[in-house]
Amino acid sequence: MAGTLDRQTIESIVRQIVYERFASSDCGCAPDSGGYKPNLVVSISARHVHLSDADVETLFGKGATLTKMKDLYQDGFFAAEETVMVVGPRKRMLPSVRILGPTRPASQVELAFTDGISLGIDMPVRESGNLANTPGCVLVGPKGVVELKQGVIRAERHVHMGPLDAESYGVKDKERMTLRVHANGCTTTFENLLVRVGKGIKLEVHLDTDEGNAADLEHASKVELIK
C-alpha cells in the first residue's frame, strides 16, 4: 500500500508528524519575565506554486478560483485542490505540483535544489516575493498554459514569528537566527534563518525538502532556535 503514495502525500504526512512532535518542543529561547513561552514548530515546505488571479483563470478557466483542500499552519493560508505541471528548459517536468492560496500579485514557483537539477533550472536562493532576475518556467493547467518570465526560486530558509515571539528571542524583522536539529545522534545546524515578524503570525520555521531530509527532521528528538 505504501508504494502507491505519491511524494506530495508522503510529505504531507511528514509535515503532520513534525507539527505534532514539535508543538511542545523546547524553543531554545531565553526565559520571558512575562511568562510567555514560544510554541516552536519546524515544518518541511514541499515544492509548491503561488498564482496570481489572472494566471488562475488562464490555467483553470475564466472565472476560476482556488478551491481550499486543507488549511496550513498559518491562519488564512491553505493548500488548494488545484495542481499544475511545472516544465523546465530541458522539457523535463514535475507533474501535479500543489498550489497554495490565497492568490498573490505575482506568480512564483518554490522548489528544492534537487527539483531544480531535475528541471535544468539554476535557481537562486531568495526570500519569497523577491523575484527580480530569477529564471522562469512553463506552467500547464487543464485549461491553459502560462509562461513565467521569472519567478522560480529556492525559498530562503526562514522563521515566521509574531511580536511576542520576537521579543522573547530578542530579535527583529529581517535579522538572522540559527536552527539546531537533533536526530538519531546526528545534530544538524542551519545558519542564517531569515526572521520574518508579523502580527497574527505563528512561530514556524520553514525548511525545504532537501534540508528537512538532510537533517532527518522526521525523526528529530529536539529542535532549538538560537539568536
Feature names for model-found ranges:
Residues 1-38:
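Protein-protein interaction and targeting regions used for scaffolding, dimerization, and localization
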Residues 14-22, 26, 60-64, 90, ...:
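Structural signal for hydrophobic packing residues in well-ordered secondary-structure cores
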Residues 41-43, 48-89, 95-142, 147-174, ...:
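Short beta-strand-centered segments at strand-helix junctions
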Residues 187-189:
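Short coil-to-beta-strand transition motifs
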Residues 224-227:
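C-terminal edge-of-domain segments
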